[in-house]
Amino acid sequence: MSRVKRGVTARAKHNKVLKKAKGYYGARRKSFRIARQAVIKSGQYAYRDRRQRKRQFRALWIQRINAGARQHGLSYSRFINGLQQAGVDLDRKVLADLAVNDKAAFGALAEKAREALAA
């Protein structure tokens, strides 16, 4: 049986991990064993936070819509309910953008929601 020398593959594996750990502080950047743990943990954080980002943006959009709706005398829930009754089919991302960047259009939507609630 011939001897297997793993110097090249081991070095390549180490370099791959150390490259991912570039920019980390101290031994997390230099030591393979510690860097490997840091890279694995960073992957876990990234996986978790890709899902949390969707929740956080939706919460931000709702806060912005609520603030815009209250400037027009409506709560968030009544504003959304009024839009649904009026048949306005805009998602929260678009509504939040209108509340921040186009206050006139958002005001028109608020008026439409108020009319639908009154009817």
UniProtKB/Swiss-Prot annotation:
Gene3D superfamilies referenced in this protein's UniProt entry, alphabetically: 6.10.160.10, Ribosomal protein L20
Pfam (any one): Ribosomal_L20
GO CC annotations, alphabetized: ribonucleoprotein complex; ribosome
The UniProt record lists the keyword Ribonucleoprotein: yes
InterPro entries for this protein: Ribosomal_bL20, RIBOSOMAL_L20_CS, Ribosomal_protein_bL20_C
Listed GO MF terms: rRNA binding; structural constituent of ribosome
Keywords from the UniProt entry: Ribonucleoprotein, Ribosomal protein, RNA-binding, rRNA-binding
Oxidoreductase listed as a keyword: no
Cross-referenced SUPFAM superfamilies: Ribosomal protein L20
GO biological process per UniProt: ribosomal large subunit assembly; translation
Function, in words: Binds directly to 23S ribosomal RNA and is necessary for the in vitro assembly process of the 50S ribosomal subunit. It is not involved in the protein synthesizing functions of that subunit.
Cross-referenced HAMAP family: Ribosomal_bL20
Similarity-based family: Belongs to the bacterial ribosomal protein bL20 family.
Record protein name field: Large ribosomal subunit protein bL20
Organism annotation: Alkalilimnicola ehrlichii (strain ATCC BAA-1101 / DSM 17681 / MLHE-1)
